[in-house]
Amino acid sequence: MSVLGVNMSLSEKQILDMKLILVFALVIFLYISTSVRNDKRYLLANEVTFKNIEQPLITEEVVNKLLIQNKGSVKNIKKVALALNSIESVLDANPYVRNSEVYVSVNGSVGVDVLQKKPLARVQTKESYYIDEEGKKMPTSPNFAVRVPLVSGDGVESNLNNMFKLLKSIDSDSFYKKEIVEIIVSKKGKYKLLLREFDLFIDFGTTENIELKLNNFKAFYKKATKDKTINKYKYVNLQIASQVICTKI
């Protein structure tokens, strides 16, 4: 009786082990099957989110075309065929894109976060291009015009670094960002600024003491507009950092 009991006990253990193996195998099978079906699912409509886009230079339509690499609608691509890193590389190669992130949710929808480059000024010399927030050149857009200061003059190319310092200061100040419409650069690295609201010509001089000069002019501007005398002036000289020399009409 005891021998039979031992055999019965061993058989039950073997059966239990087999059941556990079958359950484990079933779990693996279901996981693999689900993954395969998930990869073969067609992607749903994507959602594009733009960042740093005060003024657009790239559209959702352009992103979609880059996203699928000219293969048609995003709905025609299976998840397994979407190489996220490759798509991000394609997007990042666009001259208006600073950085991008492409991701696919569990339900198959595609998300794209696009960080657009920010133009600080538009250069108009022998060639036309933007200067971005890193001081690098970027092409103008055939579809959009960005409202930024126009930069011209025969000293642009030889003074790009110093010009960028001035552009950064202008962009960081809401007053100057709104008011400065044109910057003329001489070969000697001297700058002339034109205002949007008033017909006032500013001889800024070099980029030494940028912040001091900008603060001095802003103080003059506030006083002259408050006194309603701003229209009496045609020319303001800021070449001497500690002075604001004005010439009346």
Specify the residue positions occupied by each region the protein language model found.
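Terminal hydrophobic membrane-targeting helix
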Residues: D39-S128, D132-N143
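Extracytoplasmic/secreted envelope proteins and their assembly/folding machinery
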Residues: E60, N64, L84, E88, ...
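Envelope-exposed proteins and targeting segments
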Residues: L44-N46, I87, A93-R98, V106-V110, ...
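Short, intrinsically disordered, mixed-charge
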Residues: A93-Y96, S172, A219-K222, K226
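A broadly tuned preference for mixed-charge, low-complexity surface segments
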Residues: A81, E101-Y103, L150-I170, D203-E208, ...
